[in-house]
């Protein structure tokens, strides 16, 4: 099983939606609870994200591979589908 790393920023509404989606999906599927997740605040930990290729948050990585990068037009359903796809890939 692989670890998912979520890059986020405080006050980001898309990041709040990603967190909500993760919690909902884990509530619906016990297997998702076994996936290790790490949340990195890019403002507080710039050294951890300096070499990563992304512009928008939230962004989800599995190892060094980017699985999802939010865009300003993404609605909750798009974010939820993307979080689910990342969880499925991590299993």
Model regions and ranges:
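A short acidic, often aromatic-flanked loop/helix-cap motif at beta-alpha or helix-coil junctions
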Residues: 45-48, 76
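Non-catalytic, surface beta->alpha helical segment in thiol-disulfide oxidoreductase systems
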Residues: 62-91
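Non-catalytic interaction surface on structured domains
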Residues: 19-22, 30-34, 61, 65, ...
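Alpha-helix termini
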Residues: 26-32, 87-90
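Generic recognition of short, well-ordered alpha-helical segments
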Residues: 16-20, 51-52, 74
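Local sequence-structure signature of Cys/Sec-based thiol-disulfide redox active-site neighborhoods
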Residues: 1-28
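Structural micro-motif
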Residues: 51-62
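Thiol-based oxidoreductase modules, predominantly thioredoxin-like and allied folds used
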Residues: 8, 31-46
């Amino acid at each position: 099983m692989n670890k998912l790393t979520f890059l986020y920023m405080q006050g980001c509404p898309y990041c709040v939606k990603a967190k909500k989606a993760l919690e909902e999906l884990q509530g619906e599927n016990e297997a998702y609870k076994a996936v290790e997740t790490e949340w990195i605040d890019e403002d507080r930990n710039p050294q951890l994200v300096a070499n990563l290729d992304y512009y928008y948050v939230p962004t989800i990585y599995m190892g060094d591979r980017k699985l999802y990068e939010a865009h300003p037009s993404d609605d909750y359903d798009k974010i939820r589908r993307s979080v689910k796809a990342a969880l499925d890939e991590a299993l």
